[in-house]
C-alpha cells in the first residue's frame, strides 16, 4: 500500500495453487466443481479459479460521504462455478476497470509485490508466475516493472522480463536511494543453481537499460 498523488494504491495476490483450487476439488456440494475426472476437467478447473493481480486506488478514505474506490486494472466479469456440473460461467464483478485488465495485461502477474515513489513517479513491481506455468514464450517470463506518472495517467511499462533476467520472477522490493540518484530493486529468483542465477540487487537509474 502506497500513498501517491492524492490517492492510496494497492494490489491483490492470487497464487495459482490457491485455496480456491483446493476447495473446489475437495468439495462435494452441488455448487462446487468436485474432483476432476480427466485432464480436460482439470484444465477447466485450473482456468476457472485462476486470477491475475488487480490494482486499485482509493481517495478520501476517511470520509464516507466522499470516499472513492477505483479499480484501475481488473475485470468486469470473472468465472464462477457451477451453474452446470463441471463448468464455469461468467459473472459480473460490479466493477469496471479504468485502464485495463488484471495483471496489467499480463496473465502471469499474480501479485502486486512492491511499490515505491521515486522522482515524482509511482513504480510497481510484480510477481510473474509465467515461468512456472508450463511451456510459453520467453517474452512472457520475468517480473514486470510499471510506472505511473500521475493520478491522471495509466501505468507505463518499464520492463517485462525480470529487469534483464527472465528467471527473476519477482521484484520483491523497491527502495529509492537517499541521494535521489536512482532506485534499488531487490529481486526474487528461484534458480540459484543456474549460471548467473539466484538473488539479485539491481540499481535503476534514468536512461539506463
Predicted regions and their residues:
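Short catalytic/ligand-binding loop motif for oxyanion handling, primarily in non-cytosolic enzymes
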Residues: 17-21, 80-82, 131-134, 191-194
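Ankyrin-repeat and related helical/solenoid repeat scaffolds used for protein-protein interactions
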Residues: 135-138, 142-183
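Surface-exposed loop and turn segments in beta-propeller and other repeat-based domains
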Residues: 61-107, 153-166
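Residue-level signature of beta-propeller blades and closely related beta-rich strand-turn architectures
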Residues: 7, 14-16, 61, 128-130, ...
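Beta-propeller blade signature
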Residues: 23-64, 136-152, 196-208
Amino acid at each position: 500500500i502506497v500513498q501517491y498523488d492524492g490517492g492510496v494504491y494497492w494490489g491483490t495476490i492470487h497464487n495459482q495453487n490457491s485455496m480456491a483450487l483446493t476447495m473446489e476439488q475437495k468439495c462435494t456440494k452441488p455448487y462446487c466443481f468436485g474432483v476432476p475426472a480427466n485432464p480436460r476437467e482439470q484444465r477447466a478447473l485450473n482456468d476457472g479459479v485462476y486470477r491475475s493481480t488487480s490494482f486499485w486506488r482509493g481517495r478520501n478514505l476517511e470520509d464516507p460521504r466522499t470516499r472513492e474506490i477505483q479499480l484501475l486494472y481488473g475485470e468486469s466479469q470473472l468465472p464462477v462455478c457451477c451453474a452446470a456440473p463441471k463448468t464455469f460461467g461468467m459473472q459480473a464483478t460490479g466493477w469496471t476497470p479504468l485502464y485495463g485488465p488484471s495483471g496489467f495485461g499480463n496473465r502471469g502477474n499474480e501479485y502486486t509485490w512492491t511499490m515505491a515513489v521515486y522522482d515524482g513517479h509511482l513504480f510497481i513491481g510484480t510477481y510473474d508466475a509465467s515461468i512456472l506455468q508450463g511451456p510459453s514464450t520467453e517474452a512472457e517470463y520475468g517480473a514486470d516493472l510499471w510506472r505511473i506518472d500521475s493520478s491522471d495517467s495509466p501505468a507505463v511499462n518499464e520492463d517485462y522480463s525480470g529487469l534483464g533476467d527472465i528467471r527473476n520472477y519477482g521484484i520483491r522490493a523497491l527502495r529509492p536511494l537517499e541521494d535521489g540518484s536512482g532506485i534499488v530493486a531487490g529481486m526474487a529468483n528461484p534458480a540459484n543453481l543456474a549460471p548467473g542465477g539466484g538473488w539479485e540487487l539491481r540499481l535503476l537509474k534514468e536512461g539506463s537499460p
